[in-house]
Every structure is written in structure tokens, then in C-alpha cells.
């Protein structure tokens, strides 16, 4: 498939990045990097931050936790959440 593409953006697999995910019931859980990304892969937040900088957009993140912090500020269901509150088991967010 990559041979047919004009460009390829390598993205890190779930075990290669830190961050969060939200499942179907609204449980928000941490994911923690188990090993370094392969080749030129990097977390999506990092790729989008770099692309945004090239486009002159005013956001700059250095870690997945900073992205989650901004998500919590902007999305009401995540408003009171942070990495510390999520702990090891995660939390179910308050559905509006």
C-alpha cells in the first residue's frame, strides 16, 4: 500500500507510545510506552504538532500528557480528569 501513496506518515503502535484511550463505555485509561517506536515512527500527537508548526499553527506539545490536559480543558466530559486521577484502572467519564 505504501508504494501507491504519495507520502507515508509512520505512526507509533499502541505499545510504542504514552497516552490515553476511551472505550465504548466511556472508560478513560492510560497507555504507557513499553518500547521505543520502530524506524521513523512517532506518536500521532508528535506528528501533528510538527505538522502544525510547519503550517504556522499555535500549538506545541512536548508530551502526551499536555495533549490530554488541553483535551480536558476543551471537552466537558473530560473536564475534571488528569493523568493522576486516571491512575492504573482509569475512570468512567460523566456522560452529559
Give the ranges of each region predicted by the language model.
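Short, intrinsically disordered, charge-balanced linker/junction segments flanking boundaries
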Residues: 89-96
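Segments of small-molecule ligand-sensing domains
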Residues: 83-85
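Non-catalytic alpha/beta scaffold blocks inside enzyme catalytic domains
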Residues: 1-81
